[in-house]
């Protein structure tokens, strides 16, 4: 008779969870940051608020963002005036948009990831879907299963309303699933659409205005599995260790609330300070077992919450400016796409590493870190190992 421990051992994979493919997608509507303040104040009927517009222009200029992609076009916004008004009841209109657009954009990214992976989609055993954009039942995971034509018995996990740290959360969950289910192939999809957070400006709530200057739409998809099939599956990064922690004394630093007016975000001014204050402890916990204490010797994938966070982290750890190149490039080209951002940065890094003729997918280095920051203030840490190119 077979023992439970033997059954458990047979169910586990041999090697670490590995990212086997990455795909990304954005809406067709591209918004140039330099002209966005004019568009934003015009479409929200706020052109008379000249001082506020000047403040918003400065926010956009300092954002280090060149362009963003948005589902919301001028035409859609004109048809939905309540979405443009500050705190006007508009949840129904917003929900009607995102319950369709989140799975649609997610599908676009997933199709690219599945194509790169090179295996039939029938081999996908698990599906993780994450979005901060709206809620529905059955969820975006169900809709995506239908849109992609996945098997009806694929094991689904739906994460709603997590926020910007969740790119790390999906990797942590995918790692556990891949390593504890032999032969598992996990499709991970983060799809974010700002239709839930867009609203007109307010003189009294400048933190809301910060979000209007930073957030963009995007979806990213990964295939994760252990023990890659030789000659068929091509590993990109290995996931070695993960952690999640709530930063001490950070309650209310970042929070979001789904209300009649949509999803409202609140940020304390000291969010960059809280992140930089807690990052050393997270790094020590992650890299001390590997004997690594020089954080310039690893590659970096950090959620680009905004330029101030990146600047303070660089300063705190005395990082060389090039360490955040991939992160800053994604921020510049796409803005803050919440949970999808770090997955875009993984894609950017492996592509640039190949283009530049480097030895590994991690800018020529072996070890790296992925950080997610978001509501709580919650910090997700993932230790990555690159793969030889």
From Swiss-Prot:
The reaction(s) catalysed by this protein are: (E)-4-coumaroyl-CoA + 3 malonyl-CoA + 3 H(+) = 2',4,4',6'-tetrahydroxychalcone + 3 CO2 + 4 CoA
Q: Which UniProt keywords apply?
A: Acyltransferase, Flavonoid biosynthesis, Transferase
Q: What does changing residue 256 to F/L do?
A: Drastically reduces catalytic efficiency
What does the entry list as the binding residues for CoA? 55-62, 308
Q: Which CDD domains match?
A: CHS_like
Q: Which residues bind substrate?
A: 197, 216-217
State the Gene Ontology terms under molecular function. Answer: naringenin-chalcone synthase activity
The keyword Acyltransferase appears for this protein = yes
Q: What class of enzyme is it?
A: transferase
Tagged with keyword Cell division? no
Question: What GO biological process terms are annotated to this protein in UniProt?
Answer: chalcone biosynthetic process; flavonoid biosynthetic process; polyketide biosynthetic process
Enzyme active site: 164
Query: What's a Pfam family in this record?
Result: Chal_sti_synt_C
Q: In which pathway does it act?
A: Secondary metabolite biosynthesis; flavonoid biosynthesis
Q: Subunit notes for this chain?
A: Homodimer.
Q: What does this protein do?
A: The primary product of this enzyme is 4,2',4',6'-tetrahydroxychalcone (also termed naringenin-chalcone or chalcone) which can under specific conditions spontaneously isomerize into naringenin.
The family line of this record is: Belongs to the thiolase-like superfamily. Chalcone/stilbene synthases family.
Q: Can you name this protein?
A: Chalcone synthase 2
């Amino acid at each position: 008779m077979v023992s439970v421990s033997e059954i458990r051992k047979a169910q586990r994979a041999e090697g670490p969870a590995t990212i086997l493919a990455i795909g990304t997608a954005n809406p067709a509507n591209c918004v140039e940051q330099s002209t966005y303040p004019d568009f934003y104040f015009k479409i929200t009927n706020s052109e008379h608020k000249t001082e506020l517009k000047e403040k918003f222009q400065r926010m956009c200029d300092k954002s280090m963002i060149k362009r963003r992609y948005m589902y919301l076009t001028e035409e859609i916004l004109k048809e939905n005036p309540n979405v443009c008004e500050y705190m006007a009841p508009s949840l129904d209109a917003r929900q009607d948009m995102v319950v369709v657009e989140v799975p649609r954009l997610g599908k676009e990214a997933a199709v690219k990831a599945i194509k790169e992976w090179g295996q039939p989609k029938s081999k996908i055993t698990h599906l993780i879907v994450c979005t901060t954009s709206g809620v529905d039942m059955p969820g975006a995971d169900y809709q995506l299963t239908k849109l992609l034509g996945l098997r009806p018995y694929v094991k689904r996990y739906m994460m709603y309303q997590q926020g910007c740290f969740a790119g790390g959360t999906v990797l942590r969950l995918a790692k556990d699933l891949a390593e504890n289910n032999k032969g598992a192939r996990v499709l991970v999809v983060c799809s974010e659409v700002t239709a839930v957070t867009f609203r007109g400006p307010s003189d009294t709530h400048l933190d809301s205005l910060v979000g209007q200057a930073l957030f963009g739409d995007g979806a990213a998809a990964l295939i994760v599995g252990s023990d890659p099939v030789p000659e068929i599956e091509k590993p990109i990064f290995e996931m070695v260790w993960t952690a999640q922690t709530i930063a001490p004394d950070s309650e209310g630093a970042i929070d979001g609330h789904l209300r009649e007016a949509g999803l409202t975000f609140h940020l304390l001014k000291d969010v960059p300070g809280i992140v930089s204050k807690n990052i050393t402890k997270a790094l020590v916990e992650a890299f001390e077992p590997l004997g690594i204490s020089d954080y310039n010797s690893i590659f970096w994938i950090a959620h680009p919450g905004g330029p101030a966070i990146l600047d303070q982290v660089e300063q705190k750890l005395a990082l060389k400016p090039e360490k955040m190149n991939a992160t800053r490039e994604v921020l510049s080209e796409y803005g803050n796409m919440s949970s999808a951002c770090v997955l875009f940065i993984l894609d950017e890094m492996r592509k640039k590493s190949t283009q530049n003729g480097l030895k590994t997918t991690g800018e020529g280095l072996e070890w790296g870190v992925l950080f997610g920051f978001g509501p709580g203030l919650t910090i997700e840490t993932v230790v990555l190992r690159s793969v030889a190119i």
